[in-house]
């Protein structure tokens, strides 16, 4: 199968699962968005080996065609701490951190632009399946501040570390408990990465999206917690990357880390 044939196979498989028949769009980009939407909406359940094989070929080819960044390519650093602006799904670190929700199953909203959706969409349906197995095994939702590690599947990283950050109601102040919970997120991820003897981990901006944690406050907590961890622990980690997407977050982290 060529790229277009694989795309149509994946779409038709997921539509058949839903017992739906729709007019498939004509252009590749529209069909690609449809596939992502169907993947986003799919609840964890058994899926054929043929689907997974074709999905993996399709997604791994997409990943290979992206402008990937290795940890060694990141120039803005201070000791073990690094700052990078870009799409976390293009970063070849040992692990990337996903700001998850308590169900740990990814975002089910089609084409939503949250980090949880973006990571699951690029990784493939196996990521949701693995997360579901962990949630079923523990018998309930994931607590705020804890961390779980999974394979990264079709991402350039080796692992994804999932953590649930604190959520702030709009208009409410950040409490001392919220601060402790966010600190715990970073510590849990760093402890887990060290347990797995990883060399590098890339953090997204935990809780600052739909969870409404103020960006500057969150950055201050993130940087302080990482520095405290490095000062207090023996760790395999040599590269801890703060990955930001927006210019505003980049400016905040750059000023806090480097003073300019």
From Swiss-Prot:
<dbReference type="InterPro" id="IPR002589">
    <property type="entry name" value="Macro_dom"/>
</dbReference>
<keyword id="KW-0378">Hydrolase</keyword>
<dbReference type="InterPro" id="IPR043472">
    <property type="entry name" value="Macro_dom-like"/>
</dbReference>
<dbReference type="Pfam" id="PF01661">
    <property type="entry name" value="Macro"/>
</dbReference>
<feature type="binding site">
    <location>
        <position position="88"/>
    </location>
    <ligand>
        <name>ADP-D-ribose</name>
    </ligand>
</feature>
<feature type="binding site">
    <location>
        <position position="210"/>
    </location>
    <ligand>
        <name>ADP-D-ribose</name>
    </ligand>
</feature>
<keyword id="KW-0479">Metal-binding</keyword>
<keyword id="KW-0326">Glycosidase</keyword>
<feature type="binding site">
    <location>
        <position position="114"/>
    </location>
    <ligand>
        <name>Zn(2+)</name>
    </ligand>
</feature>
<feature type="binding site">
    <location>
        <position position="209"/>
    </location>
    <ligand>
        <name>ADP-D-ribose</name>
    </ligand>
</feature>
<dbReference type="GO" id="GO:0016787">
    <property type="term" value="F:hydrolase activity"/>
</dbReference>
<feature type="binding site">
    <location>
        <position position="107"/>
    </location>
    <ligand>
        <name>Zn(2+)</name>
    </ligand>
</feature>
<comment type="similarity">
    <text>Belongs to the MacroD-type family. Zn-Macro subfamily.</text>
</comment>
<feature type="binding site">
    <location>
        <position position="101"/>
    </location>
    <ligand>
        <name>ADP-D-ribose</name>
    </ligand>
</feature>
<feature type="binding site">
    <location>
        <position position="112"/>
    </location>
    <ligand>
        <name>Zn(2+)</name>
    </ligand>
</feature>
<feature type="binding site">
    <location>
        <position position="208"/>
    </location>
    <ligand>
        <name>ADP-D-ribose</name>
    </ligand>
</feature>
<feature type="binding site">
    <location>
        <position position="211"/>
    </location>
    <ligand>
        <name>ADP-D-ribose</name>
    </ligand>
</feature>
<dbReference type="GO" id="GO:0046872">
    <property type="term" value="F:metal ion binding"/>
</dbReference>
<feature type="domain" description="Macro">
    <location>
        <begin position="68"/>
        <end position="260"/>
    </location>
</feature>
<keyword id="KW-0862">Zinc</keyword>
<feature type="binding site">
    <location>
        <position position="115"/>
    </location>
    <ligand>
        <name>ADP-D-ribose</name>
    </ligand>
</feature>
<comment type="function">
    <text>ADP-ribosylhydrolase that hydrolyzes ADP-ribosyl-glutamate bonds. In vitro, it can remove the ADP-ribosyl modification from the human mono-ADP-ribosylated PARP1 E988Q mutant, which is primarily modified on glutamate site with only minor aspartate contribution. It cannot hydrolyze the ADP-ribosyl-aspartate bond of ribosylated S.pyogenes GcvH-L.</text>
</comment>
<feature type="binding site">
    <location>
        <position position="116"/>
    </location>
    <ligand>
        <name>ADP-D-ribose</name>
    </ligand>
</feature>
<comment type="subunit">
    <text>Monomer.</text>
</comment>
<feature type="binding site">
    <location>
        <position position="207"/>
    </location>
    <ligand>
        <name>ADP-D-ribose</name>
    </ligand>
</feature>
<protein>
    <recommendedName>
        <fullName>Protein-ADP-ribose hydrolase</fullName>
        <ecNumber>3.2.1.-</ecNumber>
    </recommendedName>
</protein>
<feature type="binding site">
    <location>
        <position position="87"/>
    </location>
    <ligand>
        <name>ADP-D-ribose</name>
    </ligand>
</feature>
